[in-house]
């Protein structure tokens, strides 16, 4: 079942329509809602800063994951160089993923989507969206994307241990890198229909609205912004911001301005 609508952009007249009022599973058209909400509510120049702190053991470091799911090899090289300037020897690299809450997969996601290359478990730091063996495309994704970031940084530093950890209060910052600006990330998300990036951008929106960085918080934030901007989201029930969920429902009016 599908619904659709064609509108004359000059007159606003509807020239064709099918099931405009019917609630349907939106699939990737959900990203239209996500992009609209993020564009309306966030600064297009906003960047995500990933910081690294000295650990409780002076030869350990802890990455504070902040939501950059498209980290690059170059960023890890940069972090390693900065850390080496501050710490002579690093034995362990750990990563703190507490910035995001809740389950790593949304209600209605097919567990096979990770191995199928459509999405990774949502953790607030990933290398190239959790892709395995390459930087682009629908290739199998890691089941432990944040831990992979710690391992990759550890390899660059000659560390013998990598794992999950927490940044201690008043810990010393030893390195940081910034993501691309939101405008670039949103553009790439739409161009490639990138599910991981869509979910990550929605987490930024949730935090900006004082909500929890989780599937529940970010879907609430998306609909809240759209409602404030005059979109008809009455009856819309989305479980994610990428459209992978099989139990999300929306209608055509929500996509109209």
Please report, for each region that a protein language model flagged, where it lies by residue:
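A short, well-structured edge-of-sheet supersecondary motif
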Residues: 1-17
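A glycine-rich, coil/turn loop motif that links secondary-structure elements
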Residues: 2, 6, 239-249
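Glycine/charged-rich beta-loop-alpha catalytic/anionic-binding loops adjacent to active sites
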Residues: 13-21, 236-237
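Short active-site loop at a secondary-structure junction
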Residues: 17-33, 37, 42-45
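Short, conserved micro-motifs enriched in small and acidic residues
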Residues: 23-32, 143-144, 245-249
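Conserved serine DD-peptidase/penicillin-binding transpeptidase domain
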Residues: 24, 40-236
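Conserved small/polar residues in nucleotide/adenosyl-binding loops
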Residues: 250-257
